[in-house]
Amino acid sequence: MSHFPWLTIIVVLPISAGSSIGFLPYRGNKAVRWYTICICILELLLTTYAFCYHFQLDDPLIQLEEDYNWINLFDFNWRLGIDGLSMGPVLLTGFITTLATLAAWPVTRDSRLFHFLMLAMYSGQIGSFSSRDLLLFFMMWELELIPIYLLLSLWGGKKRLYSATKFILYTAGGSIFLLMGVSGMGLYSSNEPTLNFETLTNQSYPVALEIIFYIGFFIAYAAKSPIIPLHTWLPDTHGEAHYSTCMLLAGILLKMGAYGLVRINMELLPHAHSIFSPWLMIIGAIQIIYAASTSPGQRNLKKRIAYSSVSHMGFITIGIGSITDTGLNGSILQIISHGFIGAALFFLAGTTYDRIRLVYLDEMGGIAILMPKMFMMFSSFSMASLALPGMSGFVAESVVFLGIITSPKYFLMPKILITFVMAIGMILTPIYSLSMSRQIFYGYKLFNVSNSYFVDSGPRELFILICILLPVIGIGIYPDFVLSLSVDKVEAILSSYFHR
């Protein structure tokens, strides 16, 4: 157990600092922007320092563990800890949130509330990934929903209230099942109710009850990830949200569902996961084909990118269902990879809209001539999204492929069928990705408009995009940079999984 409360500071700092925004002098928005960015940078530096100097990569056990009494009546403790499974998402959260704050620089209306909500969401997301208590996990899970709802409903597009309401109905509805599962697992004990992850890991349940718990948790994570058919809120939400909010949604929020699926369903409910893993593979394969087939029919640029996110989440679902070291590591790698790529694509879509004020692809064209820097960056991240070799998407999807092929749980024909479906999805991805680039950047529609003049990407925007592009290429060239964080923890999960 850590003697210094690193994780408590990391979790509490953003929302505490955000609460102080109201005390800043009213001298325009610049002070609020710089204050928020400095807090995000400080938080990221603290996280990096704590992990570099106080975390052992070869130790699969929980590290930097903290356990403080909170509510004795319910045996509810403030329990935090980090292992190889949660370290990557925590660092991703800090990185993407810092860049999203910088991306929100043009936001001037109610700037104080906007930046407070971003910092509050930061705390909720870090808390979710580092919680070691089921009730604390649920509280952090809910904490980040409120800021996102307000960011959508106050700073969104024309249909922002509809999309925000749809978002909260899906996610809050899923949270009801999450709360029921948390309550059921906590109360199922012969002695005292417990919500401690370590205790629950060694808890056994009747198969029927474990299946009920598994389904409840799965519905909550399926609504958040999203997994079909609970995905319909995502295109509407991305279509209306400000692009800085889209960066947080695509980069972090969607990954929380996949994280919960591994952390709780796979680690705490192994027998039920073994039963449902073939269905996860089937759902993931259908999701890849469905989203990749639906995406080309979307006229709205951000909705097309949103459907590509749904398709990529299918690879994560398949990797989790493969029940192999390789497949699960591939899913974790895809979580990190798509966090970068999705955030960058939505940032590019938003900055493009700021310039041309068009959202429909069939109205665009010829932007490459007018904005070559943006064209270069959009093309680079489109290549990363369609899994170009040398970029992170290719490595992640390839590792998931290997995980399915080497899985001892499935017969040869089901593995061939799933692999074939995934291959079709990988063929469809370049179709909608490259056609999207063609519709935006090629042709002469905007170039022939009288008095057409558009400003190319500025230094701030290029800085954000380069900061995201570097890890995408870095992971593509040296994937061990991410895999080294999780490989020992994945082995520990699966070794205990098969021997229980």
Curated annotation (Swiss-Prot):
Biological-process GO terms, alphabetical: ATP synthesis coupled electron transport; electron transport coupled proton transport
Compartment(s) where it occurs, according to its Swiss-Prot or TrEMBL record: Plastid, Chloroplast thylakoid membrane
One cellular component term from this protein's GO annotations in UniProt: chloroplast thylakoid membrane
InterPro entries: NADH_Q_OxRdtase_chain4, NADH_Q_OxRdtase_chainM/4, NADH_UbQ_OxRdtase, ND/Mrp_TM
Keywords noted in UniProt: Chloroplast, Membrane, NAD, NADP, Plastid, Plastoquinone, Quinone, Thylakoid, Translocase, Transmembrane, Transmembrane helix
Keyword field contains Plastid: yes
Keyword S-adenosyl-L-methionine attached: no
Residue ranges of the TM segments: 4-24, 37-57, 87-107, 113-130, 134-154, 167-187, 208-228, 242-262, 272-292, 305-325, 330-350, 386-406, 416-436, 462-482
Catalytic activity from the UniProt record: a plastoquinone + NADH + (n+1) H(+)(in) = a plastoquinol + NAD(+) + n H(+)(out); a plastoquinone + NADPH + (n+1) H(+)(in) = a plastoquinol + NADP(+) + n H(+)(out)
Primary localization: plastid
The protein's Enzyme Commission number: 7.1.1.-
GO molecular function: NADH dehydrogenase (ubiquinone) activity; ubiquinone binding
Membrane-topology annotation of the record: Multi-pass membrane protein
Domain of life: Eukaryota
Similarity comment: family membership: Belongs to the complex I subunit 4 family.
PANTHER family reported for this sequence: NAD(P)H-QUINONE OXIDOREDUCTASE CHAIN 4, CHLOROPLASTIC (PTHR43507:SF21), NADH-UBIQUINONE OXIDOREDUCTASE CHAIN 4 (PTHR43507)
NCBIfam families according to UniProt: NDH_I_M
UniProt protein name: NAD(P)H-quinone oxidoreductase chain 4, chloroplastic
Organism: Illicium oligandrum
